[in-house]
């Protein structure tokens, strides 16, 4: 499911990690994935692909330099929220992808009790580091992470009433 760009709702009665034919066909489309690891077994995941933003909670098992649908299992206890992106948001994503697709940044300083960000562009890791040190990230990466979070945050708050 992580590489999917479809707008279908997955079943809610089990952990989801399989791809439909339509989703497999969309795997080659340009995408950005932000994994926010809070130090427990679950991560918040934001994916922007073409005109669709997907937000959910899941488990990232083996992703390192690349990520694929087999590396992520969505936690069925939480809904997967999807939103169509507007034209300006789509353009922002396209520009960010073109700027970041050949980037590589890793902040090696470990910050305990802090959110770890990992950013993938077209399924390849381009950045990782901790939220407390985001000011040390290259400007384009900072902007992209903040933008993806700002688009997903209202969806989460609307869904959970937080």
Each language-model region and where it sits:
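Sec-dependent bacterial lipoprotein signal peptides
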Residues: 1-3
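Short, well-ordered, aromatic-rich surface patches in folded extracellular/luminal domains
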Residues: 6-40, 104-162
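Short, solvent-exposed loop/hinge segments that bridge or flank secondary-structure elements
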Residues: 40-50
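Hydrophobic/aromatic beta-strand elements that line small-molecule binding cavities or substrate pockets
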Residues: 44-46, 83, 117-119
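Extended intrinsically disordered, low-complexity coil regions enriched in Ser, Thr, Gly, Ala
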Residues: 46-47, 58-59, 65
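Short hydrophobic/aromatic-rich beta-strand segments that constitute the beta-sheet cores
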Residues: 53-57, 128-129
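Acidic/histidine-rich, surface-exposed loop or edge segments in extracytoplasmic proteins
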Residues: 61-81, 128
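Short, internal acidic amphipathic alpha-helical interface segments
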Residues: 77-112
């Amino acid at each position: 499911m992580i590489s999917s760009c479809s707008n279908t709702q997955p079943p809610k009665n089990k952990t989801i990690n399989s791809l439909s034919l339509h989703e497999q066909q969309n795997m080659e489309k340009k995408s950005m994935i932000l994994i926010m690891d809070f130090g427990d077994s679950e991560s918040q995941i934001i994916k922007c692909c073409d005109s669709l933003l997907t937000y959910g909670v899941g488990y990232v098992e083996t992703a390192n330099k690349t990520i694929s649908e087999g590396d992520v299992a969505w936690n069925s206890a939480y809904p997967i929220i999807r939103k169509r992106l507007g034209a300006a948001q789509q353009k922002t994503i396209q520009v960010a992808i073109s700027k970041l697709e050949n980037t590589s940044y890793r902040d090696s300083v470990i910050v305990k009790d802090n959110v770890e960000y990992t950013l993938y562009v077209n399924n390849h890791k381009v950045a990782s580091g901790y939220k407390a040190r985001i000011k040390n990230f290259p400007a384009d990466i900072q902007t992209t992470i903040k933008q993806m979070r700002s688009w997903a945050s209202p969806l989460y708050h609307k869904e959970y009433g937080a």
